[in-house]
Each structure stands twice: as structure tokens, then as C-alpha cells.
């Protein structure tokens, strides 16, 4: 992978990630394909929304279908018929989400399979081996996602163990002679000094990119913004910056304003299945009865397949009848909305008009522009 930085506007960055399988324009949003599919979508449909890269889930793909089946197909690209770049998370966040049914030790994590209750052990080395089998273009280190709330001492111990796991991840990645890219993950909770220590340790090890983890886990939005404003300028400028698991459209805007290059989140797809649709004027809840006889499209400013062909009344009808097509059309729209937002942000950075773009974004939704802390 090669990262090119073209231009900046304030702290926002316009660039691209160049892989053998294709180029990803940044800032970029990555749709989430947990089980090797963006729910309800064919790869061609996802690509048509403007997506250059997908995120796959190491933990779930390890449990089902498993490494052996993946290797028989070649890798995840061949298995799911997506021949463009794929980033896979390490499984650390999914293990964190298991709560009481997992035990974290220095060696790794012991837990019971949420599928059949089988005892399973996952450590940095195994995570690297799974992602090698997946053929991930971007591999994420295995880390512990620091919970919120956490005391500074708890956050420090978690962050320092993640640093030790980062070293083990790097060593195993190198031992496997994996030709792809490996990203480190900055932890430390809401504590700036711990974030500093984490980043320094990761830079000393050396990675192809740096992710900010452990945000959007329940902390106040102001803390997320504060940590991003503090840590992003310290990340080496020639490396991509990835904000994991974020988020709402306004979170993407605020992340870009603070120098983030990459995002992922299940929100556009999950919300689509629940009838929450993002538009240029805010969220539409298609299940509301007022859409029953509305012949207008979801968003007159959207060029997606759904908006060009179907009315709000039709989408309301599909939702009320629990038709699968409704969820699919909603998903196409939400994914395209996110990609159009990223296209707009990239264009604004290129032309030095990001402030105006951000102001228009919030004005159209009847909201004030959040201030940058620094």
C-alpha cells in the first residue's frame, strides 16, 4: 500500500490509498461486511454506491466459515467476489463486546463461541494468521478495546497490554511474510497522556497506518472530539489515519475536520434495515404514517438507484409489509448517501472550501456547527 497526500484544508486531508487491487480516495468511508457480505447487497451493488474498499470481520469469519474454507477459495476477495481492497479488523472489539463470557490474560483472550459454546482462545498470533488467510489488504493488530468508563489506571494497564500485543502482532505478521499492510491501533481511553504513550510505542514498532480505537464506546461526543484534536496532528503525516467504528454523518464530518482519513461503521446499513434513512435534510423515519401517500423520492439531491426509481410511499409500503426489497432499497440509499458525503468532503478540501461545506451541511439539518477545541 502507498499513501499519497494531495492537499489539506485546515487539518483536513485529501489523498488516496493505492493498493494492487485498486485506489481508495480519501477521506474514505468503508461499508461493513461482517460475514463477507454487506447485508442484503451484492458486491456490484455496493460498488455502485461508490465504495472503493470494504471492511470484513476477522472474528466472525474465523468462527464461520473458518480459515480452511477461506484458503480453499483463495482468500476473502475470491470467497465473496469483491476484487477491490478489503480491511479486516483483528477481532479485538468483538471479544471486548462479549462481556462476561470472555477472560482476558496477557497471553490472549479465552471465551466461549457465541455460536455453539465451544471454548476458544484468540491471541495476537492467531489473529495475524486468520487475517493472512483472509488475504486482507489492510490487517489490524490485535488489541484490547479500552472500555468506557475506565479509570486512568485501568486505561493505562489496558493500553500497555495492547502495546505488547502490538509488538507480537508485528512479529507474527513479519514471520508470515505477509505482503500486505499492517495498521497499529492507538488506545488510552479519554486520557491524552495515555494516547500519547500509545502512539509513541506504536511508532517505535512501526506500522503502515495508525487507527484511533476505543472511541464511540459510550464517551461524550466532546471527549471524542478532544482526543481526535489532540492525537491526529501527532500521527506521522505520511501515514493514513483511521477512526474505527465511527459513525453518524456528523461524526464523519467532524473526524475529517480533525484530520481523519478513513472511517467504518454499521450505521448506514443497520439503520436502513430499521427504516432510518439519511438525507441531505436530516433523518427520515420511513415507518412514519405521513409517508404513506408521499410520491416524492427520499432525497431530491441523491442520485442512488432507490431515489431515482421509487417513492417514499413505496418504501413505506415495503416496510409495512416486511418485504426484503425494502431493506435492500433502504441500504442502497444509505450507503450512497455516505459515499456522496465523502465525495463532497473530498471536493471541498480540494477547493479550500471545507468551512463552507461544513456550514451548509449543518444548516441544511437545522443545526449549529460544532467548534473546534483548538
From Swiss-Prot:
Q: Where does substrate bind?
A: 89-93, 143, 187, 214
Quote the cofactor binding remark.
Binds 1 zinc ion per subunit.
Region annotation (RNA binding) ranges: 245-251, 269-273
Query: From which residue to which does the signal peptide run?
Result: none
Q: Which family does it belong to?
A: Belongs to the queuine tRNA-ribosyltransferase family.
What are the UniProt keywords, alphabetically? Glycosyltransferase, Metal-binding, Queuosine biosynthesis, Transferase, tRNA processing, Zinc
Please identify the protein, giving its name as recorded: Queuine tRNA-ribosyltransferase
Q: In which pathway does it act?
A: tRNA modification; tRNA-queuosine biosynthesis
Any GO molecular function: tRNA-guanosine(34) queuine transglycosylase activity
The record ties this protein, via Pfam families, to: TGT
Kindly list the biological process annotations in GO that this record carries.
Answer: queuosine biosynthetic process; tRNA wobble guanine modification; tRNA-guanine transglycosylation
Q: Which reaction does it catalyse?
A: 7-aminomethyl-7-carbaguanine + guanosine(34) in tRNA = 7-aminomethyl-7-carbaguanosine(34) in tRNA + guanine
| Oligomer status and interactors | Homodimer. Within each dimer, one monomer is responsible for RNA recognition and catalysis, while the other monomer binds to the replacement base PreQ1.
Q: What is the name of the gene encoding this protein?
A: tgt
Q: What PANTHER family has UniProt attached to this entry? A: QUEUINE TRNA-RIBOSYLTRANSFERASE
Question: What is the organism of origin for this protein?
Answer: Shewanella baltica (strain OS185)
Give the CC-aspect GO terms. cytosol
User: What is the annotated role of this protein in its UniProt record?
Assistant: Catalyzes the base-exchange of a guanine (G) residue with the queuine precursor 7-aminomethyl-7-deazaguanine (PreQ1) at position 34 (anticodon wobble position) in tRNAs with GU(N) anticodons (tRNA-Asp, -Asn, -His and -Tyr). Catalysis occurs through a double-displacement mechanism. The nucleophile active site attacks the C1' of nucleotide 34 to detach the guanine base from the RNA, forming a covalent enzyme-RNA intermediate. The proton acceptor active site deprotonates the incoming PreQ1, allowing a nucleophilic attack on the C1' of the ribose to form the product.
Q: Where does Zn(2+) bind?
A: 302, 304, 307, 333
Q: Which cofactor does it need?
A: Zn(2+)
List the active site: 89, 264
Listed EC numbers: 2.4.2.29
Amino acid at each position: 500500500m502507498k499513501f499519497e497526500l494531495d492537499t489539506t484544508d485546515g487539518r483536513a486531508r485529501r489523498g488516496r490509498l493505492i493498493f494492487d487491487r485498486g485506489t481508495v480516495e480519501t477521506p474514505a468511508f468503508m461499508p461493513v461486511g461482517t460475514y463477507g457480505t454487506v447485508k442484503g447487497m451484492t458486491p456490484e451493488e455496493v460498488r455502485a454506491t461508490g465504495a472503493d474498499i470494504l471492511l470484513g470481520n476477522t472474528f466472525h469469519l474465523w468462527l464461520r466459515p473458518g480459515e480452511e474454507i477461506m484458503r480453499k477459495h483463495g482468500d476473502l476477495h475470491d470467497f465473496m467476489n469483491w476484487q477491490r481492497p478489503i480491511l479486516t479488523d483483528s477481532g479485538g472489539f468483538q471479544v471486548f463486546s462479549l462481556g462476561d463470557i470472555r477472560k482476558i490474560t496477557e497471553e490472549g483472550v479465552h471465551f466461549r463461541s457465541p455460536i455453539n459454546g465451544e471454548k476458544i482462545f484468540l491471541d495476537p498470533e492467531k489473529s495475524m494468521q486468520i487475517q493472512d488467510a483472509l488475504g486482507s489488504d489492510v490487517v489490524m493488530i490485535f488489541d484490547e478495546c479500552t472500555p468506557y468508563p475506565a479509570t486512568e489506571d485501568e486505561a493505562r494497564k489496558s493500553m500497555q497490554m495492547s502495546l505488547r500485543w502490538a509488538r507480537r502482532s508485528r512479529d507474527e505478521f513479519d514471520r508470515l511474510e505477509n505482503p500486505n499492510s499492517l495498521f497499529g491501533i492507538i488506545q488510552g481511553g479519554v486520557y491524552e497522556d495515555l494516547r500519547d504513550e500509545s502512539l509513541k510505542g506504536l511508532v517505535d514498532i512501526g506500522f503502515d497506518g495508525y487507527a484511533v480505537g476505543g472511541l464511540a464506546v459510550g464517551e461524550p461526543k466532546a471527549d471524542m472530539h478532544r482526543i481526535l484534536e489532540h492525537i491526529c496532528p501527532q500521527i506521522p503525516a505520511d501515514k493514513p489515519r483511521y477512526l474505527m467504528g465511527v459513525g453518524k454523518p456528523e461524526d464523519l464530518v467532524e473526524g475529517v475536520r480533525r484530520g481523519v482519513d478513513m472511517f467504518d461503521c454499521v450505521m448506514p446499513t443497520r439503520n436502513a434495515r430499521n427504516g432510518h434513512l439519511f438525507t441531505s435534510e436530516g433523518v427520515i423515519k420511513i415507518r412514519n404514517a405521513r409517508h404513506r401517500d408521499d410520491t416524492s423520492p427520499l432525497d431530491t439531491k441523491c442520485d442512488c438507484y432507490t431515489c431515482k426509481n421509487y417513492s417514499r410511499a413505496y418504501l413505506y409500503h415495503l416496510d409495512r409489509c416486511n418485504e426484503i426489497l425494502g431493506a435492500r432499497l433502504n441500504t442502497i440509499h444509505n450507503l450512497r448517501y455516505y459515499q456522496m458525503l465523502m465525495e463532497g468532503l473530498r471536493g471541498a478540501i480540494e477547493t479550500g472550501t471545507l468551512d463552507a461545506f461544513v456550514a451548509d451541511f449543518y444548516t441544511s439539518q437545522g443545526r449549529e456547527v460544532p467548534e473546534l477545541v483548538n
